[in-house]
């Protein structure tokens, strides 16, 4: 409950226009710990640096609350440019997108614009042997996102498109089971949006326990699993689980956020585990940065210390 109250307080303050304006003026030097620059070039360089340490990248062009269909299509074009740039740099493209950013819920000639643009993006990634992860947003978009995910897996294959489930939502265990027929590649996260107790666990202990259930059930079902957490207790539990069940290191990977626990990322890679780092980049970094601060008081303390030094 305390964690939920903390998250709510931080995100409520972050939504104030004057706070966003101040942050954009004063906090980029702090945000760049969590964001891999504002350009494609800086993001590609960040992936290359990770790969030198045996760690893969998951690129994400930041852009939320895009309102017009034209801007959504322009955003999709920019994602395609990112995929092409990654391929040109010798990187197998692995990119996350929010379907809302490419037009989910907007009609174009009788079809969802988000689905249309996602098809273009995934087709380009598939051309280069790459992969697109459909990020999950707040609970109001879960149904349509999973429906569109099912459609896209049918068209492009589970080896080229995956999605995300959030352990703080009560419904996620059922959603996971409902997707088993697809043999889906799913990233398991705890969840960073502010959700009401009617749909999400308010207590961290319940979120953590549900996270373990999601990961263990997905692994036991024989599906590729992305264990996206920095929680060392959970990481150790996953290590023990796969060892006890004879699950190979090629059946899953650990995923972490750019700028957080780099030591742990390198340690896991050195132990022979697959490790991938989520690398957000772009000018629209504020909402993402706010959610990172809201995750833990430790991140907020980092920002306060940086402001005092600055």
From Swiss-Prot:
Entry annotation: catalytic residues: 135, 187
Positions of FAD binding: 136, 166, 187-192, 229-230, 292-295
Outcome reported for the amino acid change (mutating residue 63 to A): 140-fold decrease in catalytic efficiency for proline
GO MF annotation terms: FAD binding; proline dehydrogenase activity
SUPFAM superfamilies for the chain: FAD-linked oxidoreductase
E.C. numbers: 1.5.5.2
Annotated site location: Critical for catalytic activity: 278
Stated role: Converts proline to delta-1-pyrroline-5-carboxylate.
Name of this chain's protein: Proline dehydrogenase
Annotated organism of origin: Deinococcus radiodurans (strain ATCC 13939 / DSM 20539 / JCM 16871 / CCUG 27074 / LMG 4051 / NBRC 15346 / NCIMB 9279 / VKM B-1422 / R1)
Lineage: Bacteria, Thermotogati, Deinococcota, Deinococci, Deinococcales
């Amino acid at each position: 409950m305390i964690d939920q109250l903390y998250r709510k307080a931080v995100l409520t303050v972050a939504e104030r226009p004057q706070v966003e304006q101040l942050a954009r003026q004063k906090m980029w030097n702090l945000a760049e710990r969590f964001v891999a620059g504002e350009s494609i070039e800086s993001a590609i360089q960040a992936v290359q640096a990770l790969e030198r340490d045996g760690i893969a990248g998951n690129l994400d062009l930041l852009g939320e609350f895009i309102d017009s269909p034209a801007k959504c299509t322009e955003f999709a074009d920019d994602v395609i440019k990112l995929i092409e740039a990654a391929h040109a740099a010798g990187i197998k493209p692995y990119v996350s997108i929010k379907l809302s950013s490419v037009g989910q819920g907007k009609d174009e000639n009788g079809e969802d614009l988000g689905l249309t643009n996602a098809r273009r993006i995934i087709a380009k990634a598939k051309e280069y042997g790459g992969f697109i992860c459909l990020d999950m947003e707040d609970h109001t978009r879960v149904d349509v996102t999973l429906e569109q995910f099912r459609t896209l897996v049918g068209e492009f294959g589970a080896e080229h498109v995956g999605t995300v489930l959030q352990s703080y939502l009560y419904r996620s265990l059922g959603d996971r089971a409902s997707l088993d027929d697809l043999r889906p590649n799913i990233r398991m996260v705890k969840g960073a949006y502010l959700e009401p107790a009617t749909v999400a666990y308010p207590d961290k202990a319940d979120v953590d326990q549900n996270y373990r259930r999601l990961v263990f059930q997905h692994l036991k079902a024989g599906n590729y699993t992305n264990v996206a957490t920095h929680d060392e207790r959970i990481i150790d539990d996953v290590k023990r689980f796969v060892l006890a069940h004879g699950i190979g290191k090629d059946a899953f990977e650990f995923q972490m956020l750019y700028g957080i626990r780099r030591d742990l990322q390198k340690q896991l890679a050195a132990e022979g585990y697959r490790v991938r780092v989520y690398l957000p980049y772009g000018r629209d970094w504020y909402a993402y940065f706010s959610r990172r601060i809201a995750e833990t008081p430790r991140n907020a303390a980092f920002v306060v210390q940086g402001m005092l030094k600055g």
